[in-house]
Amino acid sequence: MATNNNNNNGNPILRSLETSCCFLATLFPKVFCTLVLTWSLYVLLFIIPNYIKSSLNSTILNIIGITLYVLCIISYYKIILIGPGSPLDYPELRINDLNRMINENPYNNNNNDEEPGDLPPESMIIHTMKVNGNQGYRYCTKCSVWKPDRSHHCSSSGKCILKMDHYCPWFSTCIGFHNYKFFIQFLSYVAIYCWFLFIISGKILYNFITEGLFEDEILSLNLVAVLILSFAFAIAVSVFAMFSIYLCCKNLTTIEFQEKRWNYRGQANDERFNYEFDNNGKRKKINTNIFDLGIMENWKSVMGPNWITWILPITVTVTANTKSMISQDEFNNGVNFKVNEEIYAKYLHNAELQQQLNQQLSSYKDRLRRERQANIV
């Protein structure tokens, strides 16, 4: 991929063609989703009323449909326009000289220099829970920024993403800290809207058959298409919506869910302190998600403090555009996160026990070595 990009940079025609293709690729899902939603609203407003006898019922259905349509459109474009957020948005997280920082990183155990290099912000040093093995705090060599907890580099977006969940081609953007709320709302709105259309069109088709209307009338193909598509989308989107709500209540991202499921990071780094001992001396696993604050607190941390923010697509996070300094909003910026103090205390306790055990084993090995040397003499 890098080779192709280098070749294209030398040829303006290929570079222009590549830019146009990328633009069309990102434009297509936006146009497609907008047209499908608008077409479904057209069917609801201008075709379905022809099969409903009561004008009052038709008006009520139209109001509900328009409301759901507007919510779908607003949440869809808020996902795109607000974006997920990136460490690059915060000047404090930028590394001025990456090579110097790597060579002089005071948090690197292999460092022998006393002169420190670039340091992460103080708030990040205080609150960071995940460190990169023996190499200290995480940083991205491609973006030249410090990587806060739960952030990852997205190859599709070409930059690091705050609390990255996944890259979604239907929006041509990443789902992350700032737009995850709107992603959940969009899935919920679309699922409700699709079930709403399916029930209405299904009832019309049922009456059309049972009342023998097919003998004198022709059923609109648009209505049949809405029936089929709304049912298919309702099932698919409902599954995604429920899964996203589940992850939200667990305070997990899709990446963290997969890492936890497949143990991607490995036993050596993450599993050493994920257990405790009961009164009988048996080992049992503890909750490994240090960001799990409980269902309601997890939900509020993403969806906002009250039911109004839960229902309406209202921004509840603090973006770098409104408050550029991380310290101005300590736990609502995608850089620092609240942790479960009980789980954190268990981690510390188990780490201390592990350290004591290592010291005892080291002392025992030293004693055995001295005894062997004494016996040899």
From Swiss-Prot:
<feature type="topological domain" description="Cytoplasmic">
    <location>
        <begin position="1"/>
        <end position="31"/>
    </location>
</feature>
<keyword id="KW-0449">Lipoprotein</keyword>
<feature type="transmembrane region" description="Helical">
    <location>
        <begin position="182"/>
        <end position="202"/>
    </location>
</feature>
<dbReference type="Pfam" id="PF01529">
    <property type="entry name" value="DHHC"/>
</dbReference>
<dbReference type="GO" id="GO:0019706">
    <property type="term" value="F:protein-cysteine S-palmitoyltransferase activity"/>
</dbReference>
<keyword id="KW-0472">Membrane</keyword>
<keyword id="KW-0926">Vacuole</keyword>
<feature type="topological domain" description="Cytoplasmic">
    <location>
        <begin position="244"/>
        <end position="377"/>
    </location>
</feature>
<dbReference type="InterPro" id="IPR001594">
    <property type="entry name" value="Palmitoyltrfase_DHHC"/>
</dbReference>
<dbReference type="GO" id="GO:0005794">
    <property type="term" value="C:Golgi apparatus"/>
</dbReference>
<comment type="function">
    <text>Palmitoyltransferase specific for VAC8. Palmitoylates VAC8 at one or more of its N-terminal cysteine residues, which is required for its proper membrane localization.</text>
</comment>
<comment type="similarity">
    <text>Belongs to the DHHC palmitoyltransferase family. PFA3 subfamily.</text>
</comment>
<keyword id="KW-0808">Transferase</keyword>
<keyword id="KW-0812">Transmembrane</keyword>
<keyword id="KW-0564">Palmitate</keyword>
<feature type="transmembrane region" description="Helical">
    <location>
        <begin position="223"/>
        <end position="243"/>
    </location>
</feature>
<feature type="transmembrane region" description="Helical">
    <location>
        <begin position="32"/>
        <end position="52"/>
    </location>
</feature>
<keyword id="KW-0012">Acyltransferase</keyword>
<dbReference type="GO" id="GO:0005774">
    <property type="term" value="C:vacuolar membrane"/>
</dbReference>
<dbReference type="GO" id="GO:0005783">
    <property type="term" value="C:endoplasmic reticulum"/>
</dbReference>
<feature type="topological domain" description="Lumenal">
    <location>
        <begin position="203"/>
        <end position="222"/>
    </location>
</feature>
<feature type="transmembrane region" description="Helical">
    <location>
        <begin position="63"/>
        <end position="83"/>
    </location>
</feature>
<feature type="active site" description="S-palmitoyl cysteine intermediate">
    <location>
        <position position="168"/>
    </location>
</feature>
<feature type="domain" description="DHHC">
    <location>
        <begin position="138"/>
        <end position="188"/>
    </location>
</feature>
<dbReference type="InterPro" id="IPR039859">
    <property type="entry name" value="PFA4/ZDH16/20/ERF2-like"/>
</dbReference>
<keyword id="KW-1133">Transmembrane helix</keyword>
<dbReference type="GO" id="GO:0006612">
    <property type="term" value="P:protein targeting to membrane"/>
</dbReference>
<protein>
    <recommendedName>
        <fullName>Palmitoyltransferase PFA3</fullName>
        <ecNumber>2.3.1.225</ecNumber>
    </recommendedName>
</protein>
<feature type="topological domain" description="Cytoplasmic">
    <location>
        <begin position="84"/>
        <end position="181"/>
    </location>
</feature>
<feature type="topological domain" description="Lumenal">
    <location>
        <begin position="53"/>
        <end position="62"/>
    </location>
</feature>
